[in-house]
């Protein structure tokens, strides 16, 4: 092997680098931690494993060992990093046997530094930071595939055959400047020996500065981050990360694109005679013209910032077992979580602590809390069918009802939440876009809002302002929780396991109570059915409520100006830990809970068929799945291993409030439809004699005396009256027996009702009003709602209750 010459032989020795190498080697071999044991001995032994190539070093340990060493590394990181890796390599070889030495000889090892005190904003990365150790934070917006990178190359001279080893590659294909053989004059003709060269994993990711660091009104800055070794594929788009590394300057690859030369390079040769042998030969010739450089960040350590209990990031929380997580917790965390789980008013206390600046709307806040907890995602073993566990919530309401405040509060609280506006977002911005990479010119997928919010919450404000084609784009993401893309030759199915919290304004700016929900919002039926909970927020004039809201707003202004914090039961960090721990539970549905689910679903279906005209939206099996998810979330809230009947009842109550709340238009009992029905009945009976006509005229005259304004009742009053009549008829049926029961005459039913409320009537006018209201409610129950059936039609029909009708519990 006489013709093999090391490329390192002609290098001038770096005295400072050698000193750092020796001191860092001593640090790895001798530093002892809190337990008076060698801190990094075990980690170095594990580097023998094929999949391990990185050792993680705490910067605080370096400062404790030697302040000069830590300061030198921090100020001249890029210069001394190869010496640190060499020190790690030699220290690892000292503890290996002969077989392990052969494996470790060609292995590239890395040092990952973390726990650096000072943090630099992405916007503050400038030329003076180049080469030093820097810590930055940002959100991942794009990840590239992992590629092999040529780290240390071995070149063979094509003239004399001498091999030059260990040629360091500086972010581009770098050949030796000349042949290592002193007698050979070759400077350009080299071939790469792939078998003798060292390749490492290489990945480029792009981060964007976080909203917390972004100055008001500024466009977010982005920076490309280069990761190697074990750091590749550790983060996904949407993760908020803490990155330690150094700022580097690299030539713009677009200027160095190969193969071939750019057309503009020939401009420098115009107007002067050139020899055929001349031309652009690479970097040297490229330096003749303007060479643009760009900055990138070479990372040695990257981790998700939102680490909660047990040291795990929130994205992996749901995969953990709660017992395993419990063992990783500190005693302080355990006592706090135990205290919270034993709290009987945990729902109210967490809700009040999460939304201290928003008054009232307890059901809305509870629904958002259950959305943060989520249900249990399931997948069948045979067919592979997936059932989503995430809960989607939509807030519909008048302006100034704190819809956007709820969204903003969730965005600030949730470790992985994306806030976007429906009007300003396109379909590609919500799902994913296919863009061309500036360097490789390959098409790569850039994550949209739903992908960035994977395993989190996507808050979409002004949902009703979205174009129809953009709403269609999220159909698949809301139910199947995937995004399918077929663009520019890229075919992929991406995960979008996010809960959607949407806020929408009603048509015309004000919610019309006389119309059901589906006519108040500009949403298609498929989109509406994909929401588990709808909450309608109506701005009503109420002296007590208005006073309380005004007090809360003024308190907020005073607390902000005086820099005082509102007293809450729980701290935000404690709630984050509790939710992360509760999401590890996967409660099973008990037999009683299953029966309760079926019973509540049947009630929803019956109420939908009974009030088809005024139903807020169609009740389908998706609402049954919503009940299951809400029940599981309630079980998780109490850290339960099983879904109980009380959880189902609470979930049904919440779902009913989100549905019934919008089914409250006022009932006008003097409508033209009612009068038309009376006219039709009278026209059919004109040939039955004048006495009947006289009777009808008398009834009409009596009805005419009633003020039409008093014939308009609220939906709540209509519901109460109909329930009273139905329950009375059911009681009669039970007392007489089903076989002997023939029904109740309408006149007898009206007379019974008037007798019941006799104490509330003072004048004859009150009597006429109540009688007319009762008669017209009965008429509506028969002809429109079909709750009552006419057993014997006629002027005074015999009535009975529809056998399938179920009286609601409200």
From Swiss-Prot:
Belongs to the MCM family. Component of the mcm2-7 complex. The complex forms a toroidal hexameric ring with the proposed subunit order mcm2-mcm6-mcm4-mcm7-mcm3-mcm5 (By simililarity). This is DNA replication licensing factor mcm-6. It is found in: Nucleus. Its EC number is 3.6.4.12. It is an enzyme of class 3 (hydrolase). Residues 346-553 form the MCM domain. Keywords: ATP-binding, Cell cycle, DNA replication, DNA-binding, Helicase, Hydrolase, Nucleotide-binding, Nucleus. GO terms for cellular component: MCM complex; nucleus. Acts as a component of the MCM2-7 complex (MCM complex) which is the replicative helicase essential for 'once per cell cycle' DNA replication initiation and elongation in eukaryotic cells. Core component of CDC45-MCM-GINS (CMG) helicase, the molecular machine that unwinds template DNA during replication, and around which the replisome is built. One of its GO terms (molecular function) is DNA helicase activity. A motif (Arginine finger) lies at residues 529-532. ADP binds at residues 622, 625. The keyword Cell cycle applies. Residues 685-705 are annotated as: Disordered. Coiled coil: none annotated. InterPro entries: MCM (IPR031327), MCM6 (IPR008049), Mcm6_C (IPR041024), MCM_CS (IPR018525), MCM_dom (IPR001208), MCM_lid (IPR041562), MCM_N (IPR027925), MCM_OB (IPR033762). GO terms for biological process: DNA replication; DNA replication initiation; double-strand break repair via break-induced replication; mitotic DNA replication. The keyword DNA-binding applies. It catalyses: ATP + H2O = ADP + phosphate + H(+). The lineage of its organism: Eukaryota, Metazoa, Ecdysozoa, Nematoda, Chromadorea. ATP binds at residues 400-404, 505. CDD domains: MCM6 (cd17757). SMART domains: MCM.
